[in-house]
Design a protein with these regions (language model features):
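Beta-propeller domain segments
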Residues: 22-28, 138, 155-158, 168, ...
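Surface loop/turn motifs at the tips and blade-to-blade linkers of beta-strand repeat domains
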Residues: 36-41, 81-86, 127-133, 181-186, ...
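Beta-rich catalytic cores
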Residues: 43, 79, 86-89, 96, ...
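Acidic, glycine-anchored loop motifs typical of Ca2+
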Residues: 73-79, 116-118
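Asp-box/WD-like beta-propeller blade repeats and closely related beta-sheet repeat scaffolds
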Residues: 94, 106-144, 152-156, 179
Length: 363
C-alpha cells in the first residue's frame, strides 16, 4: 500500500532507510541484462511512449513532464527536455489523437502534440476536475480500445466510506472529458490501470493496520459496473469470494457476495503501482502478453515486502519475481514505480527512490 503522505515525508517517516546515490545490484532472469536509461531525475513516476517512440515521464514533485528521447537508439536517453511545467502533481500520462493527456492530482488536462515535440506549443486544456490531494494523491489516465478515457483516483483514507463517488474508483469519460460516469468502484488505490485484450486491468493498494499479512495486494480485471470490495471486503485467495472486513465492521458479509475478487495476489503491503503488458519483439516468446508490475515497497511491515518487479500471468494468476535487488537486507536502494515497453522491445522501469529509469533487455 501507498503511505498517505507526500513521498519525501514518507521516506523519512517510514524508516525505509533509503540511502543516497545507491547503485542496486539488480537481478533479472538468465538471458536478460539491466542498464541505466536515465538518471538525475526528481522522483520520476509514470511514463508514456509517444507516437514517435520518445519516452515521456512525470515528475509530480517538480510539477513537470519530461521527454527522454533515445533517437540514436543506443539504449540511453539522449537528453532531458521539459515538455510542460507548473503542473499540479502530474502523474499518469497518455497519448490519444494528437494530444498528450496528463492526470494532475486535481484533474486531467491535455496538450496538443505532434510527432517529435519535446516542448508544449500551447497551454494546457483542462478537461476533468478531480478531488485533489487527500492522502492518495496520484491520478492515472488511460485510453481504451473504445476511444474512451479512463481515470483512476484513490481514497482519502485507509478505510472509510467516501462521500465523493470519484474516490476509490475508476471513471470513464469521452476523450474531451464529457459524459463521465463510474466504471469500477471499491478500489482503495488503483494506481496502475492498463488495457490488454479488451480487458482493463488494475493494481490496487490494500488497507493498512491489519498486521503484516492482511490483506494481500491484489490485481484485478475490471468490468463496467464492477464492485471490487473496499472498504467492506478484501480478497484473501485469488479468484475466491472476498471476505468481510470485521475490523471495519460496516455493512455485512453479504456485501462481499457482490465483490469481484482479485485474479492474482502478492504479499501484503508491497504497494503495486504501474503495470505493463509485454507486446515488444525482443523478449523470448514466453513473455509475450505477460503482465509486469512494479511493487513500490512496504513502509509498515516488520519484514519489508515489495521493492521489485514481478511477472503476472493474466490467465493463471501466477506471480513470479522478474527484477529484484532494490532491497538490500532491510535497506531500500530504489523503489520501482512504473513500466513501459520501449520501441526496441526493452522494458523501462522508473525508480523514484533514486531518480532513475532502468532498462531491461534480452541478451
Amino acid at each position: 500500500m501507498r503511505k498517505l503522505l507526500w513521498m519525501a515525508a514518507a521516506l523519512a517517516a517510514s524508516g525505509l532507510g533509503l540511502a543516497s546515490a545507491q547503485t542496486p545490484d539488480l537481478k533479472v532472469p538468465d538471458g536478460f541484462k539491466v542498464s541505466l536509461y536515465a538518471e538525475g531525475l526528481s522522483q520520476p513516476r509514470f511514463m508514456a511512449v509517444a507516437p514517435n517512440g520518445d519516452i515521456f515521464l512525470s515528475e509530480p514533485r517538480s510539477g513537470t513532464v519530461l521527454v527522454l528521447p533515445d533517437r540514436n537508439k543506443d539504449g540511453k536517453a539522449d537528453s532531458k527536455a521539459t515538455f510542460a511545467s507548473g503542473l499540479n502533481q502530474p502523474h499518469g500520462l497518455a497519448f490519444h489523437n494528437g494530444y498528450l493527456y496528463v492526470a494532475n492530482t486535481d484533474g486531467v488536462v491535455r496538450f496538443a502534440y505532434k510527432s517529435g515535440d519535446i516542448k508544449a506549443t500551447g497551454s494546457a486544456q483542462k478537461l476533468v476536475s478531480l478531488p485533489g490531494g487527500g492522502g492518495h494523491w496520484t491520478r492515472t489516465v488511460e485510453f481504451g480500445p473504445d476511444g474512451k478515457m479512463y481515470v483512476a483516483t484513490g481514497s482519502t483514507c485507509n478505510v472509510c466510506e467516501e462521500s465523493d463517488s470519484k474516490r476509490a474508483s475508476v471513471w470513464v469519460y469521452d476523450a474531451d472529458g464529457k459524459n463521465g460516469k463510474p466504471y469500477a468502484t471499491g478500489l482503495r488505490n488503483p494506481v496502475g490501470i492498463e488495457w490488454n485484450g479488451g480487458t482493463l486491468y488494475a493494481t490496487n493498494n490494500g488497507r493498512d493496520q491489519l498486521g503484516d499479512d492482511l490483506p494481500p495486494e491484489g490485481f484485478y480485471k475490471l468490468k463496467a459496473g464492477g464492485f471490487y470490495g473496499w472498504p467492506y471486503c478484501y480478497t484473501t485467495q485469488a479468484g475466491q469470494p472476498q471476505v468481510w472486513d470485521k475490523d471495519f465492521g460496516r455493512k455485512s458479509a453479504a456485501t462481499c457476495q457482490d465483490a469481484t475478487p482479485a485474479f492474482a495476489l502478492t504479499t501484503a503491503h508491497s504497494a503495486p503501482l504501474g503495470l505493463a503488458f509485454y507486446d515488444g519483439g525482443s523478449f523470448p516468446a514466453a513473455y509475450k502478453g505477460q503482465m509486469f508490475v512494479a511493487l513500490h515497497g512496504s513502509w509498515n511491515r516488520s519484514t519489508k515486502s515489495g521493492f521489485k518487479v514481478v511477472q503476472v500471468d493474466p490467465k493463471s494468476g501466477k506471480v513470479s519475481d522478474f527484477m529484484t535487488g532494490f532491497l538490500k537486507g532491510q535497506t531500500a536502494q530504489g523503489r520501482p514505480v512504473d513500466l513501459v515497453v520501449a520501441p526496441d522491445g526493452a522494458l523501462l522501469v522508473t525508480d523514484d527512490g533514486e531518480g532513475r529509469v532502468w532498462r531491461v533487455q534480452a541478451q
